Amino acid sequence: MATRLANVPQREAGTILERKEQALKPPAMFKVVLLNDDYTPMEFVVMILQQYFSRDRETATQIMLTVHREGKGVCGIYTRDIAATKVELVSTHARQAGHPLQCVMEEA
């Protein structure tokens, strides 16, 4: 004797179930941004860009100069979790090194 499962809809023989297509959205992206200050050495900023954002020395120097001249510079664009992790890593490293360097994330 067949047992009937609770909460399982019964269907007639020959019924075809159609699968609904789900529209997947790409994840929201966030810019990781370094903010200028008058105390953090430029060389430290270049090192941060190389170590945490995998920038070559030339690119890191260009971003550092943008931070210096314009007040802020974009290090990279990432998903929310990765951006938040990079902000925390950079902020912790700067704090441990005794520098007031600020790193924030902004919606891209």
From Swiss-Prot:
What would be one Pfam family of this protein?
A: ClpS
Alphabetized InterPro entries for the sequence:
ClpS (IPR022935), ClpS_core (IPR003769), Ribosomal_bL12_C/ClpS-like (IPR014719)
The UniProt entry, under SUPFAM superfamilies, shows: ClpS-like (SSF54736)
Give the top-rank taxon of the lineage listed in the UniProt record for this protein. Bacteria
Give GO terms for biological process: protein catabolic process; proteolysis
Q: How does it assemble?
A: Binds to the N-terminal domain of the chaperone ClpA.
What family does this belong to?
Belongs to the ClpS family.
What exactly does this protein do?
A: Involved in the modulation of the specificity of the ClpAP-mediated ATP-dependent protein degradation.
**Name of the molecule in the record:** ATP-dependent Clp protease adapter protein ClpS
- This protein's species is Cupriavidus necator (strain ATCC 17699 / DSM 428 / KCTC 22496 / NCIMB 10442 / H16 / Stanier 337)
Its taxonomic placement starts with: Bacteria, Pseudomonadati, Pseudomonadota, Betaproteobacteria, Burkholderiales
Q: Which gene encodes it?
A: clpS
